[in-house]
Amino acid sequence: MGGTKLTHVTTTNPNNSNIHGPVVDEVEGLIKVYKDGHVERSQLLPCVDPSLPLELGVTCSDVVIDKLTNVWARLYVPMTTTKSSVSKLPLIVYFHGGGFCVGSASWLCYHEFLARLSARSRCLVMSVNYRLAPENPLPAAYEDGVNAILWLNKARNDNLWAKQCDFGRIFLAGDSAGGNIAQQVAARLASPEDLALKIEGTILIQPFYSGEERTESERRVGNDKTAVLTLASSDAWWRMSLPRGANREHPYCKPVKMIIKSSTVTRTLVCVAEMDLLMDSNMEMCDGNEDVIKRVLHKGVGHAFHILGKSQLAHTTTLEMLCQIDAFIHHYDPLN
């Protein structure tokens, strides 16, 4: 799609309360839902076209997945050299975070992070711009993820970038709500039919899970108003994204246990942030599954540090995480 920007941006209007009635749910500064169902999103983070500096060694373009649902993806493809072009590269299918309700594959923070991930890990990356709740409550995002994989299955022989891709080595990845989506998509593809590709593993960065009973890390971090994710915002994201009438005991709020022991998805990397209210739920999903799950705890950093953190610690830890993901994909010890 070249430089075409496919994302839709909704801006705020101070008169909306008069037109659409009172606000019935919101996450301050990010999203408001009005009584008549109108949804207003604030664009706090800039959206960018699919362009990258030449020196990064990665090309970028947007592709349409489904015209009817307006689902699209941003592709990052490492530039080949004479030395590297002999072997094909793994593919990471990535789902952005945002509580299922906000976010875009064109957000600058994701664009920069995934370009670095592609360059560092020597992988193609496909960042999926899925449908958002509350207009499209779950499982819409899960369905879009599955459709993105089915699109890959059809596109593998029709695109120049596909010639560089090893479709036998696909990793489903995402952060926060995107980590939840990645695992749900993997579960839905646990018994694939007519797929000429293989999901080798999942990479879950601070995956978004919850429950009605509060965890210790939720009580410890959840009321920190400086945190990216608070208890108030976490609860609001779930209210706006779950099927009508569901609470936080719904299966969508829990890790998919069947996929952890799946014979088709053989490996999982879980990246946990110490200062994240999700820490306990992320650690718990790994307990007893050490044979198939590699758990990495990033100390001193909070939720979404890898895309929103501005401190030197966040920057250094992001570099470490990129190295850990690279090591997980390519089977080596990052400390050696």
UniProtKB/Swiss-Prot annotation:
<dbReference type="InterPro" id="IPR050466">
    <property type="entry name" value="Carboxylest/Gibb_receptor"/>
</dbReference>
<keyword id="KW-0719">Serine esterase</keyword>
<feature type="short sequence motif" description="Involved in the stabilization of the negatively charged intermediate by the formation of the oxyanion hole">
    <location>
        <begin position="96"/>
        <end position="98"/>
    </location>
</feature>
<dbReference type="GO" id="GO:0071456">
    <property type="term" value="P:cellular response to hypoxia"/>
</dbReference>
<protein>
    <recommendedName>
        <fullName>Probable carboxylesterase 6</fullName>
        <ecNumber>3.1.1.1</ecNumber>
    </recommendedName>
</protein>
<keyword id="KW-0378">Hydrolase</keyword>
<feature type="active site">
    <location>
        <position position="176"/>
    </location>
</feature>
<feature type="region of interest" description="Disordered">
    <location>
        <begin position="1"/>
        <end position="20"/>
    </location>
</feature>
<dbReference type="Pfam" id="PF07859">
    <property type="entry name" value="Abhydrolase_3"/>
</dbReference>
<feature type="active site">
    <location>
        <position position="276"/>
    </location>
</feature>
<dbReference type="InterPro" id="IPR013094">
    <property type="entry name" value="AB_hydrolase_3"/>
</dbReference>
<dbReference type="InterPro" id="IPR033140">
    <property type="entry name" value="Lipase_GDXG_put_SER_AS"/>
</dbReference>
<feature type="active site">
    <location>
        <position position="303"/>
    </location>
</feature>
<comment type="function">
    <text>Carboxylesterase acting on esters with varying acyl chain length.</text>
</comment>
<dbReference type="InterPro" id="IPR029058">
    <property type="entry name" value="AB_hydrolase_fold"/>
</dbReference>
<comment type="similarity">
    <text>Belongs to the 'GDXG' lipolytic enzyme family.</text>
</comment>
<dbReference type="GO" id="GO:0106435">
    <property type="term" value="F:carboxylesterase activity"/>
</dbReference>
<feature type="compositionally biased region" description="Polar residues">
    <location>
        <begin position="7"/>
        <end position="19"/>
    </location>
</feature>
